[in-house]
């Protein structure tokens, strides 16, 4: 920008110096122009480009003439400049060939003077147009630095700036004739937020009613007051600005930004769109006294507020419809509250100019009042009334974020209209107790899920009144309804008379018992005849038919041979079973012996001596394994039964040594043949004495071999034995420290964000009811009195929530009016409610009259420590209470 300004100053100085030379040079230029019959090629080219057809569509209908002339002048100007450059190039080429002629040099100087004259006229016309259009930046320097293609950019800039000319302040600033260079530095392209905020500034009522300032300082303070965005310490305003610039698509992030809004220091409220910064508020509140709305009534009675400079803040809860006074002037009434004590409201009256300037203020706006004038309320009303005599004594600070209505419903089903502070609790003082009981009735772990209740109607068995009232029964006097109903039904039921007969006295036999059982089970006594289809099926040669026929034949044979029922004692049954087992064992042993003798007699060798034959013919031992044929495959047997053949007896307490394994017949024959060969050679085999327990000593060679094996086995050191385990351990540790394993450990699921969101939702669903319950408890503890509707019987002289039936029936003098219900507690823990300032009776529990104000909810007490429950003197009795004094 500075370079452009320097070029502009240099150009104007050159124009002023050549003003004296221009008249004479103009005549020469005319003669030269008339003398030259042939026009220049570049003049025609730039004249064609200077028509401005491509930009006439954007220009307005009223400015088409001016725009066309301006474009023609600019095109002519730039076309001549191009001619100059082309002439310079041509002269340079001629200079290379030979010295340039003098007429061409004179023509170049004359053209330069002509162009300077045209440039001067063009600059004057541009300055007039820029002044008329109220444009700050002169575009005259742009053609000197930009190429010919951008010659029409000043026109575009001019049109773009004309669209913003909507504000009077903005046009007034543009009308300044001369601006210093320091001001030109600030002319930068503005952001949309800054431009919009600047355009909105004159329309905001904040400047109309500037905060708590004298009229002579209002203008200066308005100009010197920094904007809320410029204040670095204004966190509240900065947060709100970010909130306002959120795009519509990001509306889901709005609650997070709202939670970051800070509380205004003086009013104690959270503001949605603050209009005054925190530093500005601290400057305005300097030297002034802050009085809360609930304290105004007390301060008016004890202090002289007219002599003090005081300020109060409140929220517009309700606006009464503007009314007309007796003098004909219109006034309005606002109901104000600070949202901390919703029971006390203040009425603000607006008259005259105050009403004209502020009657459009919306409900829910936070305002500040400076030195409000007190007014006398109507007869019978105790409400505080204030008025303002000047609009500048009202400061509009923003919108109350926590102002809302109760979320409960009335008994008639309509929504409650009571005002609540959403930051403290969502329910008013009339519905909070019922909502707290409803929330406490459910289990905390099942706040957001189904926690029992009645069965849906479509699944109910009955819908009678008794079933609806007594679904699960009830208890009265320690007896359940079900047991009482059963006992009563048994008592009421008539007793059947049983006639004593001979059949009842005599013990019935088995046949009669069977017949009675069949009758109870519904079994027919007579056998049913078979159908023809069943007979045809039984006649077919199938496996099922044959098996059924065999089964029926066996059943008939067993039924005919044995009686259906046998009576036998336990001892006889045991003896019978024992005898049967012995007979079975005897049969098995005989069969085994016969089979063994037959197999041994068949396979006998002629070379075997008589002694061996006699030994083979002897009876085997109990549990011996008998030989089997080689061709037969022996089935697999369990390990516990190894060495025992099928059908043998198992003796668990037999101390005899195990029998030698028996060889097969072929192996036995081979063994006998080998023994015969050894004897033929003269070798005598000594028999081993089975009763000899002394071991035979080993030879020296065998002993040496055993020692060598033992030494070889002991040469392995314990370190060598532990080496494989250590190596394996090192490999495992190396793998744990490897990059691959660390990568596996650090690997995370791509659904981690979804899991975190689900956990956050679960935590939110779990903690939200607890937070609401805690808010209710805090509000109920802080609520010490509640306004209510009471009745006073002037005949009986009592005041209560509802009249007695006798007073209504006898038509006593009843007077309904507003009352206050107060909560009290006794040091012993007993609580009571009173419609008077103090209860009229003593405590029912301890008999003392030491009532203290308490909240709506009884304070919860946790477990007591040992020092609180310790009684060093023991439990005090009534007759020793005087010793404590």
Curated annotation (Swiss-Prot):
InterPro entries tied to this protein: Mcm10, MCM10_OB, NA-bd_OB-fold, Rep_factor_Mcm10_C, Znf_Mcm10/DnaG, Znf_Mcm10_C
Covalent cross-link (Glycyl lysine isopeptide (Lys-Gly) (interchain with G-Cter in SUMO2)), residues: 639, 772-773
Residue ranges of the region described as Disordered: 23-260, 579-642
Modified residues (Phosphoserine): 656
UniProt biased composition (Low complexity): 218-228, 603-621
N-terminal domain, as annotated region: 1-153
Keywords, alphabetical: Coiled coil, DNA damage, DNA replication, DNA-binding, Isopeptide bond, Metal-binding, Nucleus, Phosphoprotein, Ubl conjugation, Zinc, Zinc-finger
Compartment(s) where it occurs, according to its Swiss-Prot or TrEMBL record: Nucleus
Coiled-coil parts of chain: 101-139
GO molecular function: double-stranded DNA binding; enzyme binding; identical protein binding; single-stranded DNA binding; zinc ion binding
The UniProt record lists the keyword Coiled coil: yes
Biased composition regions of type Polar residues, renumbered to the chain: 193-217, 236-260
Basic and acidic residues bias locations: 63-74, 107-121
Pfam annotation, one family: zf-CCCH_Mcm10
Annotated family: Belongs to the MCM10 family.
Record comment regarding domains: Each zinc finger-like domain binds a zinc ion and is involved in both ssDNA and dsDNA binding, as is the OB-fold domain. The N-terminal domain mediates homodimerization.
Record text on subunit structure and interactions: Self-associates. Interacts with ORC2. May interact with MCM2 and MCM6. Interacts with the DNA polymerase alpha subunit POLA1. Interacts with RECQL4; this interaction regulates RECQL4 unwinding activity. Interacts with WDHD1.
Role this protein plays: Acts as a replication initiation factor that brings together the MCM2-7 helicase and the DNA polymerase alpha/primase complex in order to initiate DNA replication. Additionally, plays a role in preventing DNA damage during replication. Key effector of the RBBP6 and ZBTB38-mediated regulation of DNA-replication and common fragile sites stability; acts as a direct target of transcriptional repression by ZBTB38.
Protein's recorded name: Protein MCM10 homolog
Biological classification of the source: Eukaryota, Metazoa, Chordata, Craniata, Vertebrata
């Amino acid at each position: 920008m500075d370079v452009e300004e320097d070029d502009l100053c240099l150009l104007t100085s050159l124009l002023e110096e050549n003003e004296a030379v221009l008249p004479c040079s103009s005549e020469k230029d005319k003669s030269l122009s008339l003398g030259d019959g042939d026009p220049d090629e570049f003049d025609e080219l730039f004249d064609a480009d200077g028509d401005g057809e491509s930009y006439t569509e954007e220009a307005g209908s009223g400015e088409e003439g001016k725009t066309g002339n301006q474009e023609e002048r600019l095109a002519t100007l730039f076309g001549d400049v191009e001619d100059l450059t082309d002439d310079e190039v041509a002269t340079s080429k001629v200079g290379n060939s030979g010295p340039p002629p003098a007429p061409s040099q004179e023509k170049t100087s004359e053209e330069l003077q002509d162009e300077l004259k045209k440039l001067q006229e063009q600059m004057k016309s541009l300055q007039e147009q820029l002044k008329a259009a109220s444009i700050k930046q002169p575009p005259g320097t742009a053609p000197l630095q930009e190429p010919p293609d951008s010659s029409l950019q000043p026109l575009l800039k001019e049109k773009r700036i004309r669209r913003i000319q909507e504000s009077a302040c903005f046009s007034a600033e543009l009308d300044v004739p001369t601006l210093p260079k320091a001001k030109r530095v600030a002319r930068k392209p503005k952001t949309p937020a800054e431009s919009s905020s600047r355009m909105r500034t004159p329309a905001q009522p904040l400047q109309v009613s500037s905060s708590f300032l004298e009229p002579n300082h209002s203008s200066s303070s308005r100009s010197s007051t920094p904007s809320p965005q410029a204040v670095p310490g204004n966190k509240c305003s900065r947060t709100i600005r970010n909130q306002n610039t959120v795009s519509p698509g990001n509306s889901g992030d709005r609650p997070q930004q709202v939670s970051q809004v800070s509380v205004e220091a003086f009013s104690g409220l959270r503001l949605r769109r603050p209009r005054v910064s925190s530093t500005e508020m601290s400057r305005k509140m300097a030297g002034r006294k802050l009085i809360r709305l609930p304290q105004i009534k007390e301060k008016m009675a004890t202090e002289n507020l007219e002599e003090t400079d005081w300020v109060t803040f409140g929220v517009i809860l309700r606006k009464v419809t503007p009314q007309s006074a007796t003098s004909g002037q219109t006034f309005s009434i606002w109901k104000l509250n600070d949202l901390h004590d919703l029971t006390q409201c203040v009425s603000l009256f607006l008259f005259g100019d105050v009403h004209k300037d502020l009657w459009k203020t919306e409900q829910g706006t936070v305002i500040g009042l400076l030195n409000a004038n007190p007014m006398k309320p109507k007869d019978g009303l105790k409400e505080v009334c204030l008025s303002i005599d000047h609009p500048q004594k009202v400061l509009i600070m923003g919108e109350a974020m926590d102002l809302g209505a109760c979320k409960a419903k009335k008994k008639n089903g309509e929504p409650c209209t009571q005002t609540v502070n959403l930051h403290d609790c969502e329910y008013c003082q009339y519905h909070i107790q019922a909502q707290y009981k409803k929330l406490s009735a459910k289990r905390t772990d099942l706040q957001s899920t189904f926690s029992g209740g009645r069965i849906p109607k479509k699944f109910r068995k009955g819908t009678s009144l008794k079933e609806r009232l007594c679904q699960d029964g009830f208890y009265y006097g320690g007896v359940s309804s079900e047991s009482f109903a059963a006992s009563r039904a048994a008592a009421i039921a008539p007793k059947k008379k049983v006639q004593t007969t001979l059949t009842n006295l005599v013990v019935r036999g088995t046949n009669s018992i069977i017949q009675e059982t069949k009758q109870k089970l519904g079994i027919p006594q007579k056998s049913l005849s078979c159908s023809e289809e069943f007979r045809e099926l039984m006649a077919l040669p199938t496996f099922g038919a044959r098996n059924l026929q065999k089964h029926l034949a066996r059943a008939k044979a067993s039924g005919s041979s044995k009686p259906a029922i046998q009576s036998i004692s336990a001892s006889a049954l045991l003896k019978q079973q024992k005898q049967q087992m012995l007979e079975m064992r005897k049969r098995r042993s005989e069969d085994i012996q016969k089979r063994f003798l037959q197999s041994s007699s068949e396979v006998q060798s002629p070379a075997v001596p008589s002694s061996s034959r006699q030994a083979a013919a002897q009876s085997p031992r109990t549990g011996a394994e008998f030989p089997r044929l080689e061709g037969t495959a022996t089935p697999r047997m369990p390990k516990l039964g190894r060495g025992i053949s099928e059908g043998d007896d198992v003796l668990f307490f037999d101390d005899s040594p195990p029998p030698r394994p028996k060889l097969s017949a072929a192996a036995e024959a081979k063994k006998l043949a080998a023994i015969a060969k050894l004897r033929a050679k003269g070798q005598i085999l000594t028999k081993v004495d089975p009763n000899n327990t002394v071991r035979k000593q080993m030879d020296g060679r065998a002993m040496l071999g055993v020692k060598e094996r033992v030494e070889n086995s002991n040469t392995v050191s314990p370190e060598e034995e532990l080496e494989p385990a250590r190596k394996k351990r090192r490999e495992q540790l190396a793998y744990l420290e490897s990059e691959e394993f660390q990568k596996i450990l650090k690997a995370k699921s791509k659904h981690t964000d979804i899991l975190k969101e689900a956990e956050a939702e679960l935590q939110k669903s779990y903690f939200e009811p607890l937070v609401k319950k805690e808010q209710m408890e805090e509000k109920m503890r802080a609520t010490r009195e509640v306004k209510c509707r009471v009745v006073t019987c002037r005949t009986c002289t009592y005041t209560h929530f509802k009249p007695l039936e006798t007073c209504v029936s006898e038509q006593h003098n009843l007077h309904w009016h507003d009352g206050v219900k107060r909560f009290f507690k006794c040091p012993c823990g007993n609580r009571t409610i009173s419609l008077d300032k103090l209860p009229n009776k003593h405590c029912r529990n301890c008999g003392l009259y030491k009532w203290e104000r308490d909240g709506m909810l009884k304070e919860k007490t946790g477990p007591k420590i040992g020092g609180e429950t310790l009684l060093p003197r023991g439990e005090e009795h009534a007759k020793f209470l005087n010793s404590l004094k």
